[in-house]
């Protein structure tokens, strides 16, 4: 099957590579976001999907706004008679004229069990809300975001140690396997699909900068879920000795709940462990953190370097 591929980040590049390597598909062209400045030097750099495409000599198209530039895009794609467009984390909404262009239309890999968690942050939101399971959905692209008919879906278990990085790995693996299975089953007819139950739809928005700031008056489990939802793309932060510090990895402590909690209070756990008290009286064990202008470090390295004093707090 001849495919046009739309995607941008690392996980999308993994799916692209699987399609390139498969005998089931021929990737005719790739559409990805424009190159952006990255790193401390702000050097303009191609994204992972573009790099993968160029390594395999596949034509690449980039648009600042595919909605505003749809006529150019349609002209560009006209030289490549794709049967199907596959979309995974492209970063922009496709105009109707684009997604209806190929004979088999366009499909999207979404990181939740639709109609639950339609929107921009399904993976982060599933973790933030403390879900024990989520999944993937392959859907036709329609006029409204994530409301298209469903071709395939698969449940994925979430463990307490998962964060956005590990859950995205699971989603990418499951989504890749599902799309390859779909292509293998193709019999020359349009892919069968079922409508979503719109009455059961839930939604999630983009992560905001203020979402990163930890409020230690909240409960320990809620804070733990927020920290793992934000890692690694938007690190959770707090304040310590008038400087910002990133909290990268935590776990819930089994220490006894205190009836008169002091939210943000720091407590040593033997010589290597660091605990922070939360608003519900429970403690959150800090496993990895990153002080401002320093490299990430373990809790034991933080304790050795900063000499925590009795009564000091995060917040």
Swiss-Prot record:
User: Which SUPFAM superfamilies does this chain map to?
Assistant: FMT C-terminal domain-like, Formyltransferase
Q: Which GO terms describe its molecular function?
A: methionyl-tRNA formyltransferase activity
Give EC number(s), comma-separated: 2.1.2.9
What Gene3D superfamilies does UniProt report for this protein, alphabetically?
A: Formyl transferase, C-terminal domain, Formyl transferase, N-terminal domain
Q: Which UniProt keywords apply?
A: Protein biosynthesis, Transferase
Reactions catalysed, as given in the entry: L-methionyl-tRNA(fMet) + (6R)-10-formyltetrahydrofolate = N-formyl-L-methionyl-tRNA(fMet) + (6S)-5,6,7,8-tetrahydrofolate + H(+)
Q: Which InterPro entries match?
A: Fmt (IPR005794), Formyl_trans_C (IPR005793), Formyl_trans_C_sf (IPR037022), Formyl_transf_N (IPR002376), Formyl_transf_N_sf (IPR036477), Formyl_transferase-like_C_sf (IPR011034), Met-tRNA-FMT_C (IPR044135), Met-tRNA-FMT_N (IPR041711)
- Residues annotated to bind (6S)-5,6,7,8-tetrahydrofolate: 112-115
Looking at the UniProt record for this protein, which Gene Ontology cellular component terms does it annotate, in alphabetical order? cytosol
Q: What class of enzyme is it?
A: transferase
Record NCBIfam families: fmt
By sequence similarity, the record places it as follows:
Belongs to the Fmt family.
Q: What does this protein do?
A: Attaches a formyl group to the free amino group of methionyl-tRNA(fMet). The formyl group appears to play a dual role in the initiator identity of N-formylmethionyl-tRNA by promoting its recognition by IF2 and preventing the misappropriation of this tRNA by the elongation apparatus.
Give the protein's recorded name. Answer: Methionyl-tRNA formyltransferase
Give the organism's phylogenetic lineage: Bacteria, Pseudomonadati, Spirochaetota, Spirochaetia, Leptospirales
Whichever gene encodes this chain, its name is: fmt
